[in-house]
């Protein structure tokens, strides 16, 4: 979504974007248009993140199923996508979850001069096929 707004490069973490694209082997039209990386506001992270919270990178996917590495009855363009995402590391951080909104919210907030961060609770671990059904 952020690729459609002026000022996108000014608010994105361009070195992380390049590193992720190289790691995934994405180029041209394979799998996704140019992804964008938005850092959470550091002040808000320090205010919210407790010592018992896992800090990591959230991948905000551009859709359900295929963009999140889930195969239906149609083969994925990159069947190793989840494996590549799981092995990615940048400045000591790893990708800890998939969802669809965080980067858009953080990016739009930053473009408008606001501070934003997200705190995500892991409900389903698709890799080991477990879900937390008792969360509140």
Regions found by a protein language model. Name each.
Residues 1-136:
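Glycine-rich phosphate- or other oxyanion-binding loops that anchor nucleotides, phosphorylated ligands
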């Amino acid at each position: 979504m952020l690729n459609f707004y002026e000022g996108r490069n000014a608010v994105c973490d361009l070195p992380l974007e390049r590193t992720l694209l190289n790691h995934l082997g994405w180029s041209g039209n394979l799998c996704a248009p140019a992804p964008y990386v938005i850092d959470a506001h550091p002040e808000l992270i320090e205010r919210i993140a407790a010592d018992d919270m896992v800090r990591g990178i959230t991948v905000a996917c551009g859709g359900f199923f295929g963009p999140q590495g889930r195969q239906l009855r149609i083969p994925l363009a990159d069947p190793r996508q989840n494996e590549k995402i799981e092995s990615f590391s940048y400045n000591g951080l790893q990708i800890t979850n998939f969802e669809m909104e965080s980067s858009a919210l953080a990016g739009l907030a930053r473009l408008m001069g606001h501070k934003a961060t997200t705190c995500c609770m892991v409900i389903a671990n698709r890799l080991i096929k477990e879900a937390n059904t008792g969360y509140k």
